[in-house]
């Protein structure tokens, strides 16, 4: 019998990224530079196991936060929760 694989995902508001970083992230996913999928409400982004420091500082900080929660994915959702320990941006 094959083992079931389950991966954790951090759900977070798109407001934790500046608009230009979110727009760039969506473009990088669409261009298959980042692994994920875009959606009207935000995006689903895979967190690579290495070299997350090459991402923008705002995105890196969220990826690092997600990794500390043992997450392999981040779901950015416009209606997602905000976290007091992370900066937020108005757009």
Model-derived segments and spans:
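Short, compact, well-ordered microdomains
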Residues: 53-91
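Acidic (Asp/Glu-rich) sequence patches and key acidic residues
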Residues: 1-53
């Amino acid at each position: 019998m094959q083992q079931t694989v389950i991966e954790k995902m951090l759900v977070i508001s798109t407001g934790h990224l500046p608009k230009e970083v979110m727009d760039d992230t969506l473009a990088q996913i669409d261009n298959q530079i980042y692994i994920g999928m875009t959606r009207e409400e935000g995006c689903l982004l895979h967190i690579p196991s290495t070299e997350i420091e090459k991402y923008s500082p705002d995105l890196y900080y969220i990826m690092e936060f997600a990794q500390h929660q043992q997450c392999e994915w981040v779901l950015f959702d416009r209606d997602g929760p905000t976290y007091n320990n992370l900066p937020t941006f108005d757009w």
